[in-house]
């Protein structure tokens, strides 16, 4: 079995009355304050999809580079973020299955201005020693989208959709213009919920391009995910 992890929500910094900026993750309209170590772990997964081993390695590296006192264990912060719904995981027999179980129930949120996010990512890579200063230009450049990715961005910009809803609607060639269309076209049975939709979909080769396009948009920092 393979387990994949990612972070959900959007990072914002809010100033206190004393003028200090504190990190907040906004997920489905709720604000969550993060400790320094929680932010460190959450940022390891922002726009990344990692196995547990990869995540622990990334977190350990950033802890080594971090100044000041060390916190509690990696597992402690992973559990805290998971309980608060800011880190999610998906388990499957194959990479595709695990990826779908990871993303299926998450709502796709298109990002308008992605330059600050790309810059933040470059700074992280630079501090980790992954890239040099001369490589900033290449990493800051916005990657072109494929036709499939453009279609997904346009649809997600019009209607709030989960990955499972998007995969199902595109597979069945449903025309979605608004929220009502989602309910009418995809939730045709009284017992159908967004979670049963995730559970009922059996990923096969015709759906791979859609799932891959969604993952690429996320890794290229053009979308983020929120929980329902």
Residue ranges and their predicted role:
Residues 1-18, 88-89:
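N-terminal leader segment of winged-helix/HTH proteins
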Residues 6, 14-15, 24, 69-70, ...:
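Short amphipathic alpha-helical surface micro-motifs
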Residues 12-13, 26-30, 137-139:
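Short, flexible segments with low predicted structural confidence
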Residues 20-25, 29, 34:
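A short, structured beta-strand/loop element
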Residues 32-228:
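Long, charge-rich, low-complexity alpha-helical segments
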């Amino acid at each position: 079995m393979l387990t994949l992890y990612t972070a959900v929500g959007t990072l914002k910094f809010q100033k206190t009355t004393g003028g200090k900026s504190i990190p907040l993750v906004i997920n489905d309209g709720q604000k969550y304050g993060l400790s320094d170590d929680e932010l460190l772990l959450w940022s390891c997964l922002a726009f990344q999809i990692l196995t547990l081993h990869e995540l622990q390695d990334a977190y350990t590296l950033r802890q080594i580079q971090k100044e000041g006192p060390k916190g509690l264990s990696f597992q402690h912060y992973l559990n805290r973020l998971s309980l608060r719904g800011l880190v999610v995981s998906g388990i499957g027999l194959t990479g595709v299955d695990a990826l779908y179980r990871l993303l299926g129930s998450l709502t796709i949120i298109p990002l308008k201005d992605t330059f600050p996010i790309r810059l933040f990512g470059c700074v992280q890579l630079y501090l980790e020693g992954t890239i040099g200063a001369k490589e900033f230009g290449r990493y800051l450049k916005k990657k072109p989208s494929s036709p499939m990715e453009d279609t997904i961005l346009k649809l997600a910009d019009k209607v709030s959709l989960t990955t499972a809803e998007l995969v199902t609607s595109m597979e069945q060639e449903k025309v979605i213009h608004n929220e009502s269309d989602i309910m009418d076209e995809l939730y045709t049975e009284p017992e159908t919920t967004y979670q049963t939709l995730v559970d009922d979909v059996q990923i096969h080769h015709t759906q791979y391009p859609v799932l891959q396009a969604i993952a690429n948009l996320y890794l290229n920092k053009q979308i983020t995910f929120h929980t329902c």
